Amino acid sequence: MSQDTVEIRVEFGGGTELLLAPPHEKKHTLTIPRTDTAGNETNVSFLIGHIRKNLITEREELFVDGDSVRPGILVLINNGDWELEGEGDYVLQDGDEVVFISTLHGG
């Protein structure tokens, strides 16, 4: 692993995977820059932007709201609620797992 990048696992569930490019894979391994263009350490907010630009192909408004996720999407960082980790400010580390699960379902 390069010192300039971070390798993380990202998983989508509860329908969020349907927003991604076919074949709508639920699990992804991503290699992203360790710092953003301003030199700040890469955090979950950066990851959300990366997903928006590189993985989501349709209806991004169902996943993102500004620089965060929409209400109703549960975010887990290493199996813990992201609210306990500082939400979007959590600095990503090699080997982290970030899971996005929609808790909203039609019926």
From Swiss-Prot:
Location of cross-link Glycyl lysine isopeptide (Gly-Lys) (interchain with K-? in acceptor proteins): G107
Keyword Ion transport on entry: no
Domain of life: Eukaryota
InterPro entries named in the record: Beta-grasp_dom_sf (IPR012675), Mopterin_synth/thiamin_S_b (IPR016155), Urm1 (IPR015221)
Cellular compartments annotated: Cytoplasm
GO MF annotation, one: protein tag activity
Keyword list, A-Z: Cytoplasm, Isopeptide bond, tRNA processing, Ubl conjugation pathway
Major subcellular location class: cytoplasm
Pfam families in UniProt: Urm1
Gene3D superfamilies the UniProt entry points to: 3.10.20.30
The family this protein is said to belong to: Belongs to the URM1 family.
Name recorded for this polypeptide: Ubiquitin-related modifier 1
